Amino acid sequence: MSSETLKFARELISRPSITPEDEGCQQLIGERLAAQGFNLESMIFEDTTNLWARRGQGRKLFCFAGHTDVVPPGDINDWQFPPFEPTTHEGYLYGRGAADMKGSLAAMITATERFIKDYPNVDADIGFLITSDEEGPFINGTKRVIETLQERNENIDWCIVGEPSSTDTLGDIVKNGRRGSLTGDLTVLGIQGHVAYPHLAKNPVHDLAPALSELINEEWDQGNASFPPTTFQVSNIQAGTGAGNVIPGRIDTQFNFRFSTELTAEKIKQRVEAILDKHSLKYHLQWKLNGPPFLTESGALVEAVQAAIEHECGFSTTLSTAGGTSDGRFIAPTGAQVIELGPVNATIHKVNECVKISDLDKLSDVYYRCLEKLLC
């Protein structure tokens, strides 16, 4: 099992599948799943390749979810080893996607192969939802697949997303939820003019400043037992022509909320717009909901994951909702229990991304135990 997980991880890493390209990764995965009796369905939406694979029909459905796409490697000269030539060195496997998340995909496959061999007649269905658009716009990937499944009443009951959830050692952290993400693109309009004649102009930077200060200092909520307080962060500001003697005619500001289950996107929008209106601004505001918050409470999936990590790693894991968003935000609203469980995330998206080789074996074992404890 050990060499098989490592071997398959290397095969996947060697494919330079930068978003939204898949570069044949899903074909490799599909071939192995087909050999285990899975029905394969390729769902291609515009530039994105997705794979929906299911073994069985009509019973409770457990699903592994993941992505074959990776972020660009940057300057390959900064890498110790070529990013798409998987290299083992001093106990680690190096390559783009080693931790995020081709190592997880390999572990999912080998765990499933072993589980089906040991329990060929288990009374449950197993599925795989794999996309090539997780690191990018996330428009034509998991979101579209879930919409398609919902249209034909295919419902996932339990889902493990293979995102690199661990912090210091494999299994120390699992994500049983994520904060919501809401982005606002705000344009405040003024009147352009000469800096020496401010009475003939209207400076939108000055107009926005008090309102922006209020937004920054607002206490949006106090969080709860599962989520930290909601945060507001300005990410981009652009104003002016570049000339030092011109009052700008507009200011463009982008900001983001990471919000808890104490709030909804609509409540945030109402509060932001009330503050802007109070300051009598002339503005345009566009919103983009990247995903609502979700939380998987204690239940069958959480308990199976906790027991599997205790069995294979020898310690109790910690449930967390910290960090960014993942494709779990598209799966959880359907009613599925969702957990993110994967390798250590210390090197993801970095030069010299790597995963501990022994963690690939252990992760496969943890996934196997999750299947066993949940479905048997």
Curated annotation (Swiss-Prot):
Enzyme class: hydrolase
Protein name according to UniProt: Succinyl-diaminopimelate desuccinylase
Family matches, as PANTHER family: ACETYLORNITHINE DEACETYLASE (PTHR43808), N-ACETYL-L-CITRULLINE DEACETYLASE (PTHR43808:SF31)
Keyword Transferase included in the entry's annotation: no
Listed Gene3D superfamilies: Zn peptidases
CDD domains in alphabetical order: M20_DapE_proteobac (cd03891)
UniProt binding sites for Zn(2+) 1: 67, 100, 163
Required cofactor names: Zn(2+); Co(2+)
GO MF assignments: acetylornithine deacetylase activity; cobalt ion binding; succinyl-diaminopimelate desuccinylase activity; zinc ion binding
EC number: 3.5.1.18
Reaction(s) this enzyme catalyzes, per UniProt: N-succinyl-(2S,6S)-2,6-diaminopimelate + H2O = (2S,6S)-2,6-diaminopimelate + succinate
Family: Belongs to the peptidase M20A family. DapE subfamily.
Higher taxonomy: Bacteria, Pseudomonadati, Pseudomonadota, Gammaproteobacteria, Alteromonadales
Gene giving rise to this polypeptide: dapE
Active site residues per record: 69, 134 (proton acceptor)
Quaternary structure note: Homodimer.
Biological process (GO), any one: diaminopimelate biosynthetic process
Family annotation (PROSITE patterns): ARGE_DAPE_CPG2_2
Binding site for Zn(2+) 2: 100, 135, 349
Pfam family, one: Peptidase_M20
Function: Catalyzes the hydrolysis of N-succinyl-L,L-diaminopimelic acid (SDAP), forming succinate and LL-2,6-diaminopimelate (DAP), an intermediate involved in the bacterial biosynthesis of lysine and meso-diaminopimelic acid, an essential component of bacterial cell walls.
Cofactor note: Binds 2 Zn(2+) or Co(2+) ions per subunit.
